[in-house]
Amino acid sequence: MFLSMAKAKTISKEIPLAEITLRRYEKPSKLSERELVRKLCLSIGLLQPGDSRDIIVDILHVLLMARKQKKLLSSEEIEKEVIDSRKKQRLALHGIASSNIRRQIKRLRDLYLVEKVKNSYRITEFEDLGIIFEEKIEKFYLQSIVDRVKEYFGSVK
């Protein structure tokens, strides 16, 4: 019993407080809107290369379309829009369970791309994604990670 508790403590200390994956791809070119969103998701670690479970791409795309109209969407509305979008593009309807849609929205919220307002969601402050990246991810989230990594580099002699 004592041994398993000791392991649990060790494991909990190994859980990162924050993490981000950044990937560099070729410059954006003549891609469809969905493909641009897909590359963005790959670039910031929301999607893994070769992953066929790409529902997060459609969720972000739907929220970006709603931003143009300054419209907030409930998780049910997001789900409906995602299903419609995937059907139009003749994509498999994998990962469209309500629980998965909410989990993917949470991932977008964790990266400050999406915010919850009452019981609805929107791109943070209906802002441009480039500005969100600079202000929330680059200056705040990424900087806090880099600062902590520097502390570890300074501590290891």
Q: Where do the language-model regions lie?
A:
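Eukaryotic partner-binding/assembly regions in large regulatory complexes
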Residues: 1-27, 140-141
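Short alpha-helical segments that sit at the start of domains
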Residues: 23-72
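Non-catalytic, well-ordered alpha-helical scaffold segments
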Residues: 53-57, 76, 99-102
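Short amphipathic alpha-helical interaction segments
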Residues: 91-110
